[in-house]
Amino acid sequence: MSHELTLQQRLEVQAGPDPLHRAVKEAVAALAQAAIDISDLTCRGALAGITGEAQGRNTDGDIQKDLDVRADQIIRDALSALPIAVLASEEMAELDILNPGAPISVAFDPLDGSSNINTNISVGTIFSIMPTPPDASAAFTQPGSAQLAAGFVVYGPQTSLILTLGQGVDIFTLDRVERVFKLTGSMMQIPADATEFAINTSNRRHWDLPVRAYIDECLMGADGPSGKNFNMRWIGSLVAEAFRILVRGGIFLYPGDARDGYEDGRLRLVYEAHPMAFIIEQAGGGASTGRKRILDIVPGSLHQRVPLIMGSIKNVRRLEDMHTGPNVALEANAPLFGHRGLFRV
C-alpha cells in the first residue's frame, strides 16, 4: 500500500459536496490536529511537566490527571470554531451547547487510560460524531447506530488514528516529520474467529456465571469444547486492546460484576462503548453487553456505564449464547467444566 494518501485527502474524497458530510470532515480534521498536539505532550512525558499524578477527581468520580485536563482543553480549542452544536466530554459533568443549529455534535474521551501514563503504556483519545436532533440537548440520547463517524487515537510507539465514517475502517499513522496522518491500513477486517482474549482475570470471583464459563472454556484450550489453545492479553488500555483486535482479532471483555459500582461495567456508553462498537462492527466484528447489541442502546444519561464485549464476531456470539442460552444454568463452581457441566460431551 502507498502511504502517500493523507487523512485530509481521504476526508475530502469521502465528504463530497454534502454539507453534513463536510461538517464531519472538518470535525475529524480538527480532532486529528488536536491528536498531534496531545501526542507531542505524551511523547515528552516528564519533560513536558507530565507526572501522572492525580489532580483530583472528575465529575464521575474517576481520578483525574493533569494530562486529562490539558488534553480536554486542546480538543475543545480545536473544535471551538467549527459548526458543532454540542460538545460532550468525559471530563465534564454537563453538555457544552455551542451552536444549537449546527448539524453535528461531538462526544469525546480526551485521554483514555491516563492512569497508565507513569508506566509508559499506550493511552488514547476516543470520539463519536452524532447528527444534531431538533433539540440539540438530546444529541447524545440517540442509539449508537445513529453515529456519523467514530474514531480513536493510540499514542504508542506510533501515533495511530483509527476512523470510520460508516463505510469501513481505516488506519492512519502520524508522520512526525511532516506532521500529518497518512493512510497505512484500509478497509480493515477483523478475523471472524481468533484465539486471544483480554480480561482482568483477577476479578473472576465477581463475574456473572456466563463470563466465568466462557473464560474457563478458553483456559481449557484444546482439551475443551473449542478445541483450540488461547492466549490471554490484558493491557489495561481500551484503545490499545481495540487496536490489537483490529489488527489480529480476538475478544475484549469488560463485563459488569458483583462489586458495588460495577454492576453495569465501568466503560461509558457515549464516550467509549458507542464509538468502539461502531468501529468494531464496521470492521466485521461484534460488540455487545452479552445480552444486547451496543449500538442499539439508547443512553439514559450522559455518563451511563455499560458492560462491553467486543471483537471477532464468532467469539462474541459464543459469549452471547452463554448469556441467553441453556448454559446459564451451569453450576457456578464446576471446576473449568472439565468433568461436569454442559460443555463436556
UniProtKB/Swiss-Prot annotation:
Keywords: Carbohydrate metabolism, Cytoplasm, Hydrolase, Magnesium, Metal-binding, Plasmid. Substrate binds at residues 112-115, 200. Pathway: Carbohydrate biosynthesis; gluconeogenesis. Coiled coil: none annotated. Mg(2+) 1 binds at residues 90, 109, 111. The keyword Hydrolase applies. Its main location: cytoplasm. It comes from the Bacteria. Mg(2+) 2 binds at residues 109, 112, 272. Its EC number is 3.1.3.11. GO terms for molecular function: fructose 1,6-bisphosphate 1-phosphatase activity; magnesium ion binding. It is an enzyme of class 3 (hydrolase). Belongs to the FBPase class 1 family. Homotetramer. This is Fructose-1,6-bisphosphatase class 1 2. The gene is fbp2.
